[in-house]
Amino acid sequence: MTETNSRGRKIEVVGEVISDKMDKTISVLIYRMVKHAKYGKYVKKTSVFKAHDEKNQAKIGDIVKIRETRPLSKTKRWALAEVVETAKA
């Protein structure tokens, strides 16, 4: 899901837009694989992040890349970096 390094670079992740009903904000669903502590099986986990979309360009179903940023509101700590793939209508 995330790539961390000691240089302080911003983390970027790719996910799917699940909501664009808010003004200049999108909800992005992120999938990641996590190894179960006891059994060792890899399990798919999901997280939902709110991201800032200044131009309201992302739509539901789009695959987007979001970048970590300073806190913009109570729940918004990500910003839209680019739309990787548009939704098929």
Curated annotation (Swiss-Prot):
GO CC terms in record: cytosolic small ribosomal subunit
Keyword terms: Ribonucleoprotein, Ribosomal protein, RNA-binding, rRNA-binding
GO biological process: translation
Pfam families on file: Ribosomal_S17
A GO MF term: rRNA binding
InterPro entries linked to this entry: NA-bd_OB-fold, Ribosomal_uS17, Ribosomal_uS17_bact/chlr, Ribosomal_uS17_CS
Family in the record: Belongs to the universal ribosomal protein uS17 family.
Quaternary assembly: Part of the 30S ribosomal subunit.
Function of the molecule: One of the primary rRNA binding proteins, it binds specifically to the 5'-end of 16S ribosomal RNA.
Protein name: Small ribosomal subunit protein uS17
Organism (species): Bdellovibrio bacteriovorus (strain ATCC 15356 / DSM 50701 / NCIMB 9529 / HD100)
The gene coding this protein: rpsQ
